[in-house]
From Swiss-Prot:
One of its GO terms (biological process) is sporulation resulting in formation of a cellular spore. It is a peripheral membrane protein. Changing P9A: Causes mislocalization and strongly impairs sporulation. Does not affect membrane association. Keywords: Membrane, Sporulation. It comes from Bacillus subtilis (strain 168). This is Stage V sporulation protein M. Coordinates cortex and coat assembly during sporulation. Associates with the spore coat protein SpoIVA and with the outer forespore membrane, thereby serving as a membrane anchor that tethers SpoIVA and the entire spore coat to the forespore surface. May also serve as a competitive inhibitor of FtsH activity during sporulation.
Length: 26
C-alpha cells in the first residue's frame, strides 16, 4: 500500500489514506 501512496500524488495519497482509515474504523 505504501508503494502506491508514494507513487500517487500527495493529494491523492491523502484521499486514499482517509478512505482506508474510514474502512478500518467501520
Amino acid at each position: 500500500m505504501k508503494f502506491y501512496t508514494i507513487k500517487l500524488p500527495k493529494f491523492l495519497g491523502g484521499i486514499v489514506r482517509a478512505m482506508l482509515g474510514s474502512f478500518r474504523k467501520d
